[in-house]
């Protein structure tokens, strides 16, 4: 965990060392007056935000963005925003808010503001009943093969923190789950929420998530720094969406299972 913390700090320093010229963000009054809110979404994030066969956007973030816009009484302008562009697009006023699983961390909070949490990300172990283990450390053994995806940051985390395992890398979420289902890998160590829907493709496998997660991160909506009125209204809308169960129901509809660690709504923010 120490190594991961050091990497996170270095990553944060890299962000802070990158020149970003802050533009004046649109105020809540301007958004309401123009009748449009610009929402940054990942253009290729299955179950979160992607285009369907008809070319329309769909996914968890899309439903959330539409609900927020409805609460504000405005229309949505979807702005494709790749993962590295989320903070720069807020700082440069290309978007009003950023979705796309924007994890809270201190380095980003020096550049942008966050709402209350929207959802969580849980780094955990997805395995089957064919293999024993009550914690992620139990899987750090010779003879264990973990499935993962090329380019995922968790590959580096596994190499540093679970040096005894073998890694089998593929290119998609579905292929990662398939490796375990076919017995070509023993488990997956990842942000497991994003993989759960694909376990339904293999109903004969007795899937299980190791109870103790490695860590839980909170993802919130990114807002331009100092845009307090917009942030406050979004927080109130999110509190209502969490309290009504809309967030959890929408998550389960798109991911096929409940959030592993649900966000507990609080009226204080």
Residue ranges and their predicted role:
Residues 25-101, 110, 169, 253-254:
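Extracytoplasmic small-molecule ligand-binding "clamshell" domains
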Residues 27, 153-170, 238-269:
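Ligand-binding clefts/hinges and TM-proximal coupling segments of bilobed small-molecule sensing domains
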Residues 37-38, 74-75, 92-100, 143-145, ...:
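Alpha-to-beta junction loops
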Residues 43, 119-127, 192, 196-239, ...:
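Periplasmic-binding protein-like
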Residues 63-71, 130-131, 137, 152, ...:
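Extended ligand-binding regions for polar small-molecule ligands
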Residues 77-88, 133-134, 168-182, 217:
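Short helix-initiation/N-cap motifs at beta->coil->alpha
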Residues 85-88, 102-110, 159-160, 181, ...:
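A ligand-binding cleft/hinge motif common to bilobed small-molecule-binding domains
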Residues 127-145:
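Flexible hinge/capping segments at coil-to-helix
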